[in-house]
Amino acid sequence: MKKASLIFCFFSLIGWAQSSNPASLLLDEVAAKISSYDNIKFNFSYVLENQKEQIRQETNGKVIVEKEKYVLEIPEATQLFDGQKKYTILPENEEINITDATTDDNLGIDPNKLLYFYQEGYGLQMDIVQNVQGNRIQFIKLTPQDTDQGIQYLLLGIDLSSKHIYRIIEIGENGTRTTLTLQDFSPNNLLARGTFVFDAANYPNYYINN
């Protein structure tokens, strides 16, 4: 169920100081833009590669985020966080695991932190600009200040037009490259009531591990 350590244990929001560093200023804009939305939907693709070990893993999924609440879906599982409890639903096993907010049992991705992880703990430096389907993507190189993370650096791609995150690339010290690409980013959606409510009645034959 663990998809890899990319996404990662290094997330937190809540305020950071302005800087004359252009990379910091751009990321301030990104954080302010994302924070202004009532909710966000996006799809994602995830690729983990290590050529030396001949490893390649791929998955895709979708996310809905509203403040601290989220629904994360990948092919083998769905995780719902209602602000207090996490509900991890495993259809293949007909099992549901219920844990509290502080438990580190994310499906490789923490949607609460994914959109803000860059705000603390990294040295920042502007990198290349790429043209992707007509959109200018500015990459920022993030070098961890904590050298025990097992990460050489990350590249965070920002769409300069929308100020949304487009791609996160992590280069591990063991040669592993992990790429997360956000697609179909949609803010301020009209969500159904109960989007972030777990209803056990929808899973009558499931074992619930509370």
Describe each model-derived feature in a short phrase.
Residues 4-13:
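Sec-dependent N-terminal signal peptides
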Residues 101-136:
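Flexible, surface-exposed loop/linker segments and immediately adjacent secondary-structure boundaries
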Residues 60-109, 178:
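An acidic-aromatic
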Residues 33, 61-64, 78-79, 125-132:
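Short, exposed beta-strand/loop patches in secreted or surface proteins that constitute
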Residues 45-51, 73, 89, 143-145, ...:
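A generic structural motif
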Residues 15-54, 68, 205-210:
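N-terminal leader/targeting segments and the immediate start of mature chains
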Residues 122-130, 135-208:
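Gly/Pro-enriched, hydrophobic low-complexity segments
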